[in-house]
UniProtKB/Swiss-Prot annotation:
Pathway named in the protein's UniProt entry: Amino-acid biosynthesis; L-lysine biosynthesis via AAA pathway; L-alpha-aminoadipate from 2-oxoglutarate: step 1/5
GO cellular component: mitochondrion
InterPro entries according to UniProt: 2-IPM_HCS-like, AIPM/Hcit_synth_CS, Aldolase_TIM, DRE_TIM_HCS_fun_bact, Homocitrate_synth, LeuA/HCS_post-cat, PYR_CT
Top-level taxon: Eukaryota
Domain Pyruvate carboxyltransferase positions: 67-320
A Pfam family of this chain: HMGL-like
Family: Belongs to the alpha-IPM synthase/homocitrate synthase family. Homocitrate synthase LYS20/LYS21 subfamily.
One function term, GO molecular function aspect: homocitrate synthase activity
Subcellular location(s) of the protein: Mitochondrion
The protein, known as: Homocitrate synthase, mitochondrial
Entry EC number(s): 2.3.3.14
This protein's encoding gene: lys1
SUPFAM superfamilies named among the record's database cross-references: Aldolase
Needed co-factor(s): Mg(2+); Mn(2+)
Species this chain originates from: Penicillium rubens (strain ATCC 28089 / DSM 1075 / NRRL 1951 / Wisconsin 54-1255)
Length: 474
């Protein structure tokens, strides 16, 4: 039997104009940026990638349209170097994640400390829609404590690679299998959901992995877990392992990917394509070292895979609020290029891009920012701007000119931007002054400039106008 390559369904697919304020790299503030509204373009639905081909067998295995999220900010995220969540903050984060719509919320082991146990019990009493899990070692002492906290499920883990068996717990595979079965049967006897996961799965022997997973599947584990504990796996390795495992076990498959080599999102997506059912995430990807699959990044990827499923299940407009909450709690700034919520995620600057975006946003966007309650921006105050962006901005300022005049005004803005950085206010002043000169027939200066700037501006303006007259792109 030949398994055809997977088809990757794509999503379907609102503008605004910036100058970068001084705090641009600090807090993502858009003050000083001006919105440029474009016509709303229809986003035709597409259930599969038009550039792919029908791959029925792989589609049968794929869970990209029916995945579940195990949100681990309050477990993996608590292992982030900067993290300290008191009880009130944990409850606030748990409620926010529940409101967003995650399927599960995973908490630090109640065995870690007395406060961890008290926090676990407190969150279990909140009555959230999401199932509450706790993460423990594959040991009966931990299991006995975990089942008394009120959790809906227990996530059990033990290292299976030769590295961890030799240098961590010192147990062999026979011990691991027997311990796993004992813990699983005990937890299930309490009517609680249980997952068994190997640790460092991708550096474990495949025969050992399949043997232990098959054994726990037979005793009724709810999920088996694959963990790329050191972030070494590639998407291809993930797909192949999950596909093989899918043929061995009948239970659900959970996956946990660290981001040490930058593959956590791609690995999560490939795992779903191969038949995994659950993905571990954390807000902003926080966790040990480089962290794990970020919730926002996974949402971005899955919106491209099945927009309607994601929109129907998760309150996407809550994403930024959650990320701001966690970022403040762990005292980090949200990166300027963060998936979806980063300052630049939907900012367009190049003239060619701006023209197309103004006509139809899907030309340079695969995700509609409005789906996440975000805005797009066209940055027109730069040497890279194009006359279509200046025309759109002038019309927003209710200043009508001919296309030739818009182009001449654009040349003046580009000339000034070649001399020094310009702000939105500078660009607006040039547009307004140019329009006033047209109406009055005068030739007053467009901006207050030093003598040196005036000379440089005149030279640049002449150069650009000559190039424009010659039909060259400017």
């Amino acid at each position: 039997m030949v398994l055809l390559p997977p088809s990757l369904p794509v999503c379907q697919l609102k503008v605004t104009a910036p100058e970068f304020p001084s705090n641009f790299y600090l807090d993502g503030d858009h003050s000083g940026f001006v919105g440029i509204e474009t016509r709303q373009n229809p986003h035709p639905s597409a259930s599969r990638n038009p550039y792919g081909h029908d791959a029925g067998v792989t589609d049968f295995l794929s869970n990209v349209s029916r995945f579940q999220i195990i949100e681990s900010t309050l477990r993996e995220g608590e292992q982030f170097a900067n993290a300290f969540f008191d009880t009130a903050k944990k409850i606030e984060i748990a409620k926010a994640l529940d409101d967003f719509g995650v399927d599960y919320i995973e908490l630090t082991s109640p065995c870690a400390s007395e406060q961890s146990r008290a926090d676990c019990e407190a969150i279990c009493k909140l009555g959230l829609k999401a199932k509450i899990l706790t993460h423990i070692r594959c040991h009966m002492d931990d299991a006995r404590i975990a089942v008394e906290t009120g959790v809906d499920g227990v996530d059990v883990v033990i290292g299976t690679s030769s590295y961890l068996r030799e240098h961590s717990h010192g147990k062999d595979m026979t011990y691991i299998k027997n311990a796993a079965i004992e813990v699983i049967e005990f937890v299930k006897s309490k009517g609680i959901e249980i997952r068994f996961s190997s640790e460092d799965s991708f550096r474990s022997d495949l025969v050992d992995l399949l043997s232990i997973y098959s054994a726990v599947d037979k005793v009724g584990v709810n999920r088996v877990g694959i963990a790329d504990t050191v972030g070494c796996a590639s998407p291809r390795q993930v797909y192949e392992l999950v596909r093989v495992l899918r043929g061995v076990v009948g239970c659900d498959i959970e996956t946990h990917f660290h981001n040490d080599t930058g593959c956590a999102i791609a690995n999560a997506f490939c795992a779903l394509e191969a038949g995994a059912t659950h993905i571990d995430t954390s807000v902003l990807g926080i966790g040990e070292r480089n962290g794990i699959t970020p919730l926002g990044g996974l949402m971005a990827r899955m919106m491209v895979a099945d927009r309607e499923y994601v929109k129907s299940k998760y309150k996407l407009e809550k994403l930024k609020e959650i990320e701001d909450l966690v970022a403040e709690a762990v005292e980090v700034n949200i990166p300027f290029n963060n998936y979806i919520t980063g300052f630049c995620a939907f900012t367009h600057k190049a003239g060619i891009h701006a023209k197309a975006i103004l006509n139809n946003p899907s030309t340079y966007e695969i995700i509609n920012p409005a789906d996440f309650g975000m805005s797009r921006y066209v940055h027109f105050a730069s040497r890279l701007t194009g006359w279509n962006a200046i025309k759109s901005r002038a019309q927003q300022l209710k200043l009508e000119m001919t296309d030739t005049q818009y182009k001449e005004c654009t040349a003046k803005i580009k000339a000034m931007a070649d001399i020094r950085p310009i702000a939105v206010d500078d660009a607006d002043s040039i547009i307004r002054a140019y329009h006033r000169n047209l109406k009055s027939g005068e030739n007053k200066p467009l901006l207050d400039l030093t003598a040196e700037e005036q000379a440089a501006f005149a030279a640049k303006e002449k150069e650009l106008l000559e190039a424009q007259a010659a039909g060259l792109p400017v």
